[in-house]
């Protein structure tokens, strides 16, 4: 602290400054602009195999207490989920999935671009898995997340899949 009338010693030295000074967290971490799309608000396109429903009150860690649940499909079947974005651009994407003993392996695309050729959602117990998808391009308006069943869980004739949420960060 300084008494009224005091002087700062030494004087500010700015002639050799090469980088902008971080004055707030967003100067280091970016604007923090993110878009969270809950699985349960994504709209399935017509023509998919199996059934799609909202599953609630099953897993306590699901965001908003529910997930989008796709069931009774075969290997090779596809599900397209539509979601809206108010902005366009490149975002870093993460998806939180449910994993379980009867879930299989899937390929994921956003707007027809492969973002992960294979992700296994088979696990010994029901839990959540956060998958980093890297960079994805969003369009203003309608966007599409495409899920393709690559392999069913061992010993199962039909498949199961659950998505909790998609998080996109600038």
What do these predicted regions represent?
Residues 1-170:
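Extracytoplasmic
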